[in-house]
Structure formats: structure tokens, C-alpha cells
């Protein structure tokens, strides 16, 4: 490798081309050949085998056991809200109020969303957001009136007169 570098340096004019260099390179190659042959002989020699006695083997009594502290689980939101005490009513004015709806629903609080004060396009966007929110958290969404919706967490059962939505009510959810 040094020979190639040296030749490159001579070619580029960074080093002088010595005649002595060629004899040094031949001596270096001979030394390298002798070293490589010695390495080959060492590789061929079998490695010494070490015997393992049963006395030095691992015993289970020597195993270290760290002290374990049990971790108490926090009560889930379902257990906390089993005695439902709160329902949030939100009258959004713009799509920016979606954060408030999402945070309340995520905390397990049923939300009544009244979009009567919103424009048609923003109301559709907010209903679409709410439908995705309810789907992601496994809840349900129901229409109370034309522009009022109830978002219920999965553990809340809504009992009403008419369980089946008519085609006209279902068409509002169809965004296509």
C-alpha cells in the first residue's frame, strides 16, 4: 500500500524518485511475506481446549434477585366516570373550537355540540372531525336536532325513542 502511495506522490511531483526506494521496497515485501507465512502457521495450530468442571458451573443459589416494588395502576377513566356526573355543551363559533370538543371527549366527558351558529362548510368540517374523534376513541355520535350532535364515550349508553336514523338524518354525515 505504501508503494502505491509513494508512486502516486512521485507522479504528482510531491516526492523525489529515489533509486534507493526500489531496494527498500523489495526488502519490505520480503519482510511482509515472512510475516504472512508466520501468521498462516499460527492459524493452522489448534487452539488449546479448556475443560470446564462441574464445580465452577452456575448454580441457582448464586442468582441475585432485585427487590421488586409493586406499581399501583391508576384508575381508568371508565371507572372514574361510572357515576356519570357531567356533560359538556359546546357552541362552537369556528373550526378552532374543535380543540375544546376533542379535549372534553378525550377526558371521557360526553359532549353536546351545537353548530347552529356556524357556516355550512365549517359545520361540516367540525362534524367530520367529531366523527373521526368518536371513531378513534370508540365512542358514538348521534344527531339530536338538525345541527346539534351528541358525542358519547364507549361506556355511555344513550337511550332514546328512535334508535334507527332515517335516511334524511344519515345524509348529513355523508360528506361526498
From Swiss-Prot:
Any one Gene Ontology BP term: FtsZ-dependent cytokinesis
Keywords: Cell cycle, Cell division, Cytoplasm, Septation
HAMAP family: SepF
Family: Belongs to the SepF family.
Record function comment: Cell division protein that is part of the divisome complex and is recruited early to the Z-ring. Probably stimulates Z-ring formation, perhaps through the cross-linking of FtsZ protofilaments. Its function overlaps with FtsA.
Subunit structure: Homodimer. Interacts with FtsZ.
Protein name in the entry: Cell division protein SepF
Originating species: Pseudarthrobacter chlorophenolicus (strain ATCC 700700 / DSM 12829 / CIP 107037 / JCM 12360 / KCTC 9906 / NCIMB 13794 / A6)
